[in-house]
Swiss-Prot record:
Pathway: Plant hormone biosynthesis; gibberellin biosynthesis. Belongs to the iron/ascorbate-dependent oxidoreductase family. GA3OX subfamily. This is Gibberellin 3-beta-dioxygenase 4. Gene3D superfamilies: B-lactam Antibiotic, Isopenicillin N Synthase, Chain. Expressed in siliques and in seeds, specifically at the rim of the embryo and the outer integument. Also expressed in flowers. Not detected in roots, stems and leaves. It comes from the Eukaryota. GO terms for biological process: gibberellin biosynthetic process. Fe cation binds at H227, D229, H284. InterPro entries: DIOX_N (IPR026992), IPNS-like_FE2OG_OXY (IPR044861), IPNS-like_sf (IPR027443), Iron_ascorbate_oxido_reductase (IPR050231), Oxoglu/Fe-dep_dioxygenase_dom (IPR005123). It comes from Arabidopsis thaliana (Mouse-ear cress).
Amino acid sequence: MPSLAEEICIGNLGSLQTLPESFTWKLTAADSLLRPSSAVSFDAVEESIPVIDLSNPDVTTLIGDASKTWGAFQIANHGISQKLLDDIESLSKTLFDMPSERKLEAASSDKGVSGYGEPRISPFFEKKMWSEGFTIADDSYRNHFNTLWPHDHTKYCGIIQEYVDEMEKLASRLLYCILGSLGVTVEDIEWAHKLEKSGSKVGRGAIRLNHYPVCPEPERAMGLAAHTDSTILTILHQSNTGGLQVFREESGWVTVEPAPGVLVVNIGDLFHILSNGKIPSVVHRAKVNHTRSRISIAYLWGGPAGDVQIAPISKLTGPAEPSLYRSITWKEYLQIKYEVFDKAMDAIRVVNPTN
């Protein structure tokens, strides 16, 4: 795959006055995850996923209903301060406003994940995506920040650390709610219970800062192509410019408009496995805008490190509902997803659904 510097540089997309052919998507079969009958238009219907107040006494039921219906929901009164959300959005804007040459100094390596670059799913699509991003998956981001902000890196590293700490607590809280809606608890997940008792982390988090520049022909471009997240769940903060869309068979593409202080939660592949298929991992994408750029910050809460085997929760299986998926480690699943992309779930499936 050519390096970022050899192609139209993603760091300069916002300055282009015409849409390059390599970034021009067709209006039909725009991505491989859509059924042919549904892949005829980029238009989204006027509907949206529910906004759930986490202080509501019925929060577990509400989250469960939304998760089963949409594989996604929005949350308010989640405990994350507006200042922290503003700080990480400002950090992202400062980073993406830098000259392209400067950003490329913090580019991710060929074998690494952390750093600046195009979406990880790019190799699976013929056309390029109208976006740039910065991934924080380990402590190497501190070196990148030192390169980008020689005098202010300590301040920006502090923002990231606070965001990770707060999102980790929120993700754990949401996990309890979603499990509760299925009638199970973390104690019913043997490996998760052991990790909690030992003081270890149930999941590993990463952050993806995304920037979708203004686009001369947004109706023919794609900011981020349709996909599911590999995670247990993903928590997304989006700036005040819309672009996120989720897909549901009964509804088609549905735009998730941003609202102040509201976060979006997407169910990922790992939770779909844990739930034995009862809760879907949501297919989603990002569209772009002709007049306004968009920033989003995704907290990707994945599986645990090491050789922990992840499989459907035993209480959710039985003679009438056999396990749909074989056990797998987080690392192994990521490798399969990297190789076969949207066919990863099929690759670990052991039986067909009974209905």
